[in-house]
Amino acid sequence: DFDSLFKAMSKISKNELVDVCVGFDPYLQNIRMQRESLSSDLKNLAGVIKGNKNRVSAMKDTVKIALSGRRYMDNVEYSVHLILEEKTQESATTSIVEVKRICNHAGGSEIESSIPKILRANPFTPLNNIIGPRGERWMPIHVIIPHSKANQAMREIQQLLAKHQDKLDKNKIGVGFLYTVISNNGFVIEPVFFTPDSIDEIHKEVVEDGILKNIECFEDNPVARGLTNTLRYELFDLFEDIGGVHMQIGKSYNFRKGLNIESWNVIENIKHTVDPNGLI
């Protein structure tokens, strides 16, 4: 469950044991497994080989990933995927042992490390993830909170969504979660909406043709879109109530509401100084 996942991720983060720490809930995990094609898998495997200077080790990794395919995730619910870097093999081994101990203590069990190896070998992949596997509109939001508040925040998010579950089901809107950490002091929860709605020109421009030709072309769906937007803004309010912050000033989030009056006055004074005529 997410309590066990968060426990492990926070412990690993607070001890600064890894460079990348990413978790998925069951829904988003399933989406991730659906999304990629065989040709994409082969490209990723090629990246694993190219990204490893030790050809023997690279071939071993590639064979393990190919043999495990996607079956290794079949019975997995919540998962965490980790990448760590150290100056020596000895220190790396020590960190790996400690990471495994923390995960085992939280009730986890080890799976094939395909996702970290592929992420490491292919850091700049095409932006095909900006639509769902069937062509759904992808709408993520996020909140950053202290580690100590992560579990309670997740429970409150789930409670809010549960109140609207009938409407979500009726409109075939899926909600998944991505989790990550920021150094040893921040925990990121990212709810991701997959809405059966039309996509924009930017999606058609950015997503690869091989992906676009295999998706459904959803018609404009203002009801589903409206429900998604309503829930997003309800979640924004919840994030502010629990003391969360975000990384996207000027976008959907209410920057002003998250500041006390003194901080807002500082911002206004700076704005007046650099833009006295209000041109920006």
Sequence positions of predicted segments:
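C-terminal substrate-binding/cap subdomain adjacent to the FAD-binding core in PCMH-type
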Residues: 1-123
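Conserved glycine-rich FAD pyrophosphate-binding loop
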Residues: 68, 72-75, 98-280
